[in-house]
């Protein structure tokens, strides 16, 4: 750093998702599942298509829509609401909730590898039961 300069982050805590340490702005933000984002974007696309003065959707919009279509784990509102409700009952941080629902890991070990903040907070059996419940909900969607 140049002499006389100051680091604008000085005094700020270093963010670390593995420790659930996020920037201040994230404290009031809510997380969305990829499936929820997909439904919102699809709705916006349909609105645009049915409008009298249909506008071309941006490249970023279309890329995001395609991404969320590819990585959406849940295909309908009922399943999304059910999975979100299930995960809200657990003592999960909103970041962990979104990660579990978006990634849908199959084992507790895989979950802890992908989401390190789960380590030490959940027993493998408890975490496996959550994952099994999510998988059951996925298997019953249309």
UniProtKB/Swiss-Prot annotation:
Keywords linked to the UniProt accession: DNA-directed RNA polymerase, Nucleus, Transcription
Protein name, entry field: DNA-directed RNA polymerase II subunit RPB4
Physiological role: Core component of RNA polymerase II (Pol II), a DNA-dependent RNA polymerase which synthesizes mRNA precursors and many functional non-coding RNAs using the four ribonucleoside triphosphates as substrates. Pol II is the central component of the basal RNA polymerase II transcription machinery. It is composed of mobile elements that move relative to each other. POLR2D/RPB4 is part of a subcomplex with POLR2G/RPB7 that binds to a pocket formed by POLR2A/RPB1, POLR2B/RPB2 and POLR2F/RPABC2 at the base of the clamp element.
Subcellular location: Nucleus
Organism expressing this protein natively: Homo sapiens
InterPro entries: HRDC-like_sf, RNA_pol_Rpb4/RPC9_core, Rpb4-like, Rpb4/RPC9, Rpb4/RPC9_sf
GO BP field: transcription by RNA polymerase II; transcription initiation at RNA polymerase II promoter
Coiled-coil residue spans: none
Record text on subunit structure and interactions: Component of the RNA polymerase II (Pol II) core complex consisting of 12 subunits: a ten-subunit catalytic core composed of POLR2A/RPB1, POLR2B/RPB2, POLR2C/RPB3, POLR2I/RPB9, POLR2J/RPB11, POLR2E/RPABC1, POLR2F/RPABC2, POLR2H/RPABC3, POLR2K/RPABC4 and POLR2L/RPABC5 and a mobile stalk composed of two subunits POLR2D/RPB4 and POLR2G/RPB7, protruding from the core and functioning primarily in transcription initiation. Part of Pol II(G) complex, in which Pol II core associates with an additional subunit POLR2M; unlike conventional Pol II, Pol II(G) functions as a transcriptional repressor.
Family under the similarity heading: Belongs to the eukaryotic RPB4 RNA polymerase subunit family.
Gene Ontology CC entries for this record: cytosol; nuclear speck; nucleoplasm; nucleus; RNA polymerase II, core complex
Molecular-function GO term, any one: nucleotide binding
Principal cellular location given in the protein's record: nucleus
The encoding gene: POLR2D
Keyword hit for RNA-binding: no
């Amino acid at each position: 750093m140049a002499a006389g300069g100051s680091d604008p982050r000085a005094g700020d805590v270093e963010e670390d998702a593995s420790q659930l340490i996020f920037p201040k702005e994230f404290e009031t933000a809510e997380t969305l599942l990829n499936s929820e984002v997909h439904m919102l974007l699809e709705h916006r696309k349909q609105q645009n298509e049915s409008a009298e003065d249909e506008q071309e959707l941006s490249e970023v919009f279309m890329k995001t829509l395609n991404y969320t279509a590819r990585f959406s784990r849940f295909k309908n509102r009922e399943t999304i609401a059910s999975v979100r409700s299930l995960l809200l009952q657990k003592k999960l941080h909103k970041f962990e909730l979104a990660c579990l629902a978006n990634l849908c890991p199959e084992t507790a070990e895989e979950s802890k590898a992908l989401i390190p903040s789960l380590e030490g907070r959940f027993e493998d059996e408890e975490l496996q039961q959550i994952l099994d419940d999510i998988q059951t909900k996925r298997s019953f969607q249309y």
